[in-house]
Amino acid sequence: MDLRSSAETDPDLSENHPGSVPAELQSRKQEQEKLSGVVKSVHRKLRRKYIEVGDFDKIWREHCEDEQTLSEYAMAMKNLADNHWANKCEGEGRIEWCRSVCQEYFQDGGMRRVLEKDEKSARHATAGNANTDTNAPPQLSSISTSSTFQLGKIRLLDVGSCFNPFLKFDEFLTVGIDIVPAVESVYKCDFLNLQLQQPLQLASDALDAFLRQLRGPIDALPAELFHVVVFSLLLSYFPSPYQRWLCCKKAHELLTLNGLLLIITPDSSHQGRHALMMRSWRVAVESLGFKRYKYVKFSHMHLIAFRKVSPTTSSDLVSRNYPEMLYIPQDFNTFDEDGFADCYEPPRSDFEDDQMACSFAELPETPYDSDSGESQSSSAPFYELEDPILLQS
């Protein structure tokens, strides 16, 4: 009789033979470490090449042509999600967070509340200007039928989707894209080189029909098409801050006005360790025409929601060095013959100390700095990233 296979279905037997289950768990742990190694090696290779060559366009083009490596990466990620992460998330997963933010914002009045807040602020600003400029034109109400969400499907673009986790939710009309999809429902697409077309002047149901007839590979999409764009564990994949910034800029162009950009990025450090980085990210993303809506720090990641508040972006973004503000700790890693060494962190100057002090306003304990008035933190374990996938430091 095979005690191990019986223990999987008979809890009493597993209690009588406690040694059988640890052997299985050990095997699962070894498999998880192997899959995690595949993922981390791809990221390490990309960063090494970027440090050596410096031409992120060339590096990315060669990376997208390496079909074998990309296929191994996609299958490793899907295997981790299906067989290792799913049983441990216990309701605090990144996908559930994205869904809850969308439900609160689009279906439970969140959008209307922030628009009313915007309108109130505009009235106060107008009243202040009226004291010095009696010829100032009256401000029109910002809350209109076109700026609030109408009942229907929430059009969601999941970039770097891999296995299309949002497809199971009825409230979303999901388009999942990836450079190498792990499942058939995800379309092949290189988001960095995606071409943007003029917005479609169609009713909402016609836009839904347009998305339903999409076929891969996707090389171009109309602007202002989606209510939500999701970057889940995406930005840290890229070795260059400029590539991360281009992704955020493209997301802004693809979103409708007041649409949401949801960014999830890994970080196993304690809550205040990278507060300066989160402040830097906020400034960079908001420079594109966003405003932060929510910010949550889980044990192993940052989860940030931005809403699109401006239909256009400034033409003077690169000169202000906004792209470089989307850095991650791994950008400062050095490498030797065996791979990456420990992350080097230079001593802070007095100016940086002042900036660090200011950055503590970014911590989730200060709810007033998100325009929803809500920020959260969680110390509960988030097992999905305990591998630690994507983390080098």
Curated annotation (Swiss-Prot):
Positions of S-adenosyl-L-methionine binding: 94, 160, 178, 190-191, 232
Enzyme class: transferase
Example GO biological process: methylation
Region (Disordered), start-end ranges: 1-35, 118-141, 362-393
Composition-biased stretches (Low complexity): 125-136
Entry EC number(s): 2.1.1.-
Keyword ATP-binding: no
GO MF, one example: S-adenosyl-L-methionine binding
Entry keywords, A to Z: Methyltransferase, S-adenosyl-L-methionine, Transferase
Keyword S-adenosyl-L-methionine: yes
PANTHER family: S-ADENOSYLMETHIONINE SENSOR UPSTREAM OF MTORC1, S-ADENOSYLMETHIONINE SENSOR UPSTREAM OF MTORC1-RELATED
Function description: S-adenosyl-L-methionine-binding protein that acts as an inhibitor of mTORC1 signaling via interaction with the GATOR1 and KICSTOR complexes. Acts as a sensor of S-adenosyl-L-methionine to signal methionine sufficiency to mTORC1: in presence of methionine, binds S-adenosyl-L-methionine, leading to disrupt interaction with the GATOR1 and KICSTOR complexes and promote mTORC1 signaling. Upon methionine starvation, S-adenosyl-L-methionine levels are reduced, thereby promoting the association with GATOR1 and KICSTOR, leading to inhibit mTORC1 signaling.
Oligomeric form and interacting partners: Interacts with the GATOR1 complex; interaction is disrupted when samtor binds S-adenosyl-L-methionine. Interacts with the KICSTOR complex; interaction is disrupted when bmt2/samtor binds S-adenosyl-L-methionine.
Record family assignment: Belongs to the BMT2/SAMTOR family.
Identification of the protein by name: S-adenosylmethionine sensor upstream of mTORC1
